[in-house]
Regions:
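Short glycine-/aliphatic-rich beta-strand segments at the starts of folded cytosolic domains
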Residues: 319-325
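Long, Pro/Ser/Thr-rich low-complexity/intrinsically disordered regulatory tracts in eukaryotic proteins
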Residues: 2-304, 309-310, 317, 329-361, ...
């Protein structure tokens, strides 16, 4: 009764002529939910939740049904869903006593925004750095600010390496990109590196060409590393991949491997200062060249330089020094010392995929995880020392985190840490105590 009597008091919404006219246009401008474009035959999140038993990655430790449910129906504009993000950790679950990996890869830059609940926790767990909206990741390429990196005790330091990864805007990351995207990235990189060669002479090698002409070019080429195969980054190998090498052997630039671009400088004399300087200078040059082509490197104010692996966001920088340690490696306080120094120490292992021989027989070597440039020797004889370098007592010491510090600060941590570790090793050789050398938390 009340409804019939009072209905006249309820006025219908007022419709303005212009609103009626432009409503279809306005509605067409509303971004469409990317997930609505898919017709995936999936069950409920509970039924689709992955089996994480015996998964020893950070993804396996952090992911639960509640978080999985929140991410389940989300997709980025390029079609990355949450199952794509965690698939690397499901394919490679890690080992119980092995190094802890993140167990996930971003498919594109938007992944870090759309799946921020998950990625922020991964970053905090791996780097010990809490991501906040008001935090700003700083960057510093002033290599002159690095102190003491030009000299290490050569009786202990065998070599050093500095590498930096970058992702190019408007392209999906390697784990998700299409063949066409990868080839476009290759063409873009070739244009940039041709211009870079005007300042630092170098040669551009397509991995596909190297595989076909290995006998003529004296190149030893193996299959891609197992880590790239498991994560799906090695799809369509070797299509769209390339290597640029400077003629003086100071710099290697990888295209479309783990990242869109990776610069590596290796020094067999242990001069970390020069390796860091080489990467900084050429990284800034390539950044300018990519900007001119309207494809800048991806930067987020709270994450810094964004790449596919959350283990490398921030600076994308890895600084490593190969050292000989026979005593400290067996010390029970080693893990605590490394934690205090914010460093990681791993036994060396040969991960050799490409071997280029020097035509002019100059004594030089460049190692970047995939490539070694060595003197012109018989292939078996030349490779044997590198295949044997996983011997006990030889370790790589590198920065543990890549975010929360700028490039100079991270490299300085490695310089200071390695020098302190060498002092401890000398003490232990003389059977003396190292307790007074144990540092406070950096």
């Amino acid at each position: 009764m009340w409804k019939r009597e009072k209905m006249w008091m309820i006025k219908p919404p007022t419709e303005h002529p212009k609103e009626c006219k432009y409503r279809p246009v306005l509605e067409s401008l509303v971004p469409r939910d990317p997930m609505s474009r898919f017709s995936l035959k999936r069950s409920s999140p509970k039924e689709e939740f992955p089996n994480l038993d015996r998964n020893y990655t950070l993804m396996g430790a952090i992911l639960d049904l509640h978080m999985y449910t929140r991410q389940f129906n989300r997709a980025t504009e390029s079609g990355v869903i949450f199952d794509d993000i965690i698939r690397p950790g499901l394919e490679d679950p890690g080992l119980l006593n092995g190094p802890k990996s993140v167990g996930c890869l971003a498919g594109d830059a938007q992944s870090y925004i759309l799946f921020c609940d998950f990625f922020d926790r991964i970053i905090e767990s791996y780097h010990g750095y809490r991501v906040t909206s008001d935090a700003v990741q700083e960057s510093d390429f002033n290599y002159d600010n690095l102190k003491g990196g030009d000299y290490f005790d050569e009786d202990y330091v065998l070599s050093c390496e500095v590498s930096a990864g970058r992702a190019v805007d408007d392209f999906c990351f390697p784990v998700h990109c299409s063949r066409g995207e990868r080839r476009n990235l290759l063409a873009l990189a070739q244009t940039v590196l041709e211009q870079l060669s005007e300042d630092l002479p170098g040669t551009f090698h397509s991995i596909e060409e190297l595989s076909c002409e290995s006998e003529e070019r004296r190149v030893v080429m193996d299959s891609p590393p197992s880590s790239l195969i498991k994560t799906g980054v090695a799809r369509d190998w070797p299509d769209g991949r390339a290597l640029w090498l400077s003629k003086d052997g100071s710099l290697a630039i990888w295209v479309n491997m783990e990242e869109h671009l990776k610069l590596v400088s290796f020094r067999s004399d242990g001069n970390l200062q020069e390796a860091f300087k080489c990467v900084c200078i050429n990284l800034m040059k390539t950044e300018i060249l990519y900007k001119k082509l309207r494809h800048p490197f991806i930067w987020k104010h709270h994450l810094g330089w964004v790449v596919s692996s959350p283990a490398e966001v921030g600076t994308g920088l890895k600084t490593s020094v190969t050292v000989k340690l026979l005593h400290l490696a067996e010390n029970k306080r080693l893990k605590d010392i490394l934690d205090r120094l914010r460093l990681r120490m791993e036994e060396t292992a040969c991960d050799l995929s490409v071997c280029l021989y020097d035509d002019d027989r100059r004594k030089r070597a460049l190692v970047s995880g995939y490539v070694t440039v060595i003197p012109n020797l018989n292939a078996t004889e030349a490779l044997q020392p590198w295949l044997d370098r996983g011997c006990p007592g030889i370790y790589n010491i590198s920065n543990l985190q890549t975010i929360g510090f700028n490039e100079v600060e991270l490299t300085q941590l490695v310089v200071d840490g390695v020098k302190l570790i060498i002092r401890m090793e000398k003490r232990l050789e003389n059977k003396s105590s190292i307790e007074d050398l144990v540092p406070t938390k950096k």
